[in-house]
Amino acid sequence: MSEPSRTLPGTGSIEVIVGSMYSGKTEELIRRLRRAQIARQRVEIFKPDIDNRYAKDAIVSHSDLRIPSRSVRKAADILRHAHEAQVIGIDEGQFLGRALLPVVEKLARMGKRVIVAGLDQDYRARPFEPMPDLLAIAEYITKTLAICVVCGSPANRTYRKVQRAGRVVVGGTEIYEARCRRCFDLGRRASPAAEPIGDPYAQPSARPRARRAVAARRRRVR
């Protein structure tokens, strides 16, 4: 089930909306929060202050849907402002890091409905923490898909068009586009500066570590 149809008063829950960029995550988050406001529930909305693309005091979708929000520097700041809320919305959850997990759990245990939207994969198509862990503890999960700009297929990956250092580079269409699995891989292979495509879950080889250990022992003997 992706969204609760009915919950008992005081029953907390966690809802997670994940997908690539341009897949409608923020639009879906705004839709749920507006429905809660129409139902006259007390709503508090948060986003990380690193997300300054469109507005400092609002969550804004790529299609310009917006709803007022509060910017926070770290996940723990949410607890200071959410005490009276019945429904809590959090956009761009991946930017708040693993510290978001205990915050969300605490809010749900307090009987609050918590809705988190964010990227489940980074620009290399690797799991973007803490979203995979949030998926594991959520009662309700929604996976949104974009449209591949290359072939028009359903897209679940975010392709970085320009070479920038670092995992987190905040930007819009000038930097990122949605791609399907095939077109994402083709783009990565065609980029001379891109990291090699491999198994994101592969464990690092033990051989380099063994060589370093042997070299260290030899230095101590000398």
Annotated model-derived regions:
Residues 92-107, 121-128:
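Conserved ATPase-coupling elements of RecA-like P-loop NTPase cores
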Residues 32, 102-110, 130-137:
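Catalytic-core regions built around general acid/base machinery
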Residues 2-83, 122-133, 146, 162-164, ...:
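Conserved P-loop
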Residues 140-149:
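Conserved AAA+ ATPase "SRH/arginine-finger" region at the nucleotide-binding site
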Residues 82-96:
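Conserved P-loop NTPase "ATPase switch" module shared by AAA+ and STAND
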Residues 155-163:
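Short, surface-exposed amphipathic charged segments that create phosphate/polyanion-binding patches used
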Residues 89, 113-120:
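Structural recognition of the conserved hydrophobic beta-strand(s) that form the central parallel beta-sheet
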